């Protein structure tokens, strides 16, 4: 099993992904999201919310990181990118580089994404409107608030740190803030050990008893070894 471990991580990392990565990860159709309300959970320093807003998508982001000010995050972000690339390079043979081509280009994409986020976050009005200092399994958002809820590189991936009860509460919370008829999408479905999150079938069975339907859909950014699918949870319409 250890040979499948594709990344070493202590604590929860700060992410710095861009809009196109989200489009590919979750197979999004940006034009269909115009005017829709979208929540990015565990967004970190990703630029999805900034770019989505420019595309007339009502995007919001939630992460405990936002308890910090812009200058604090800026220092942490650049350090995190360097650590991430160094650890990734050690096991570069395990990844699918079709999109990123190699660590050097990936680093440049991360830096550009972080700069885009930082510029948006540094604007006081934008920061207050779009970025909530919050973490699962309890969010400050209203029930039935968002058409689409995204959770990237947190649930399941950190399954060695957060147990199944946490995951069940977190998934219920994502569904709570999702509008009836809306969707929750989660990617990837693997732990850092390279295995499908072991308790995922049991979690989905419990949600099914609560009226939630789930399906696996193919991702268009299968960078992590074995990460071919993302999970979609459908909230039943009234």
Residue ranges and their predicted role:
Residues 1-36, 47-55, 67-78, 83:
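Class I SAM-dependent methyltransferase Rossmann-like catalytic core
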Residues 137-150:
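A short acidic, Gly/Pro-enriched loop at the edge of an enzyme's catalytic core
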Residues 192-238:
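Class I S-adenosyl-L-methionine
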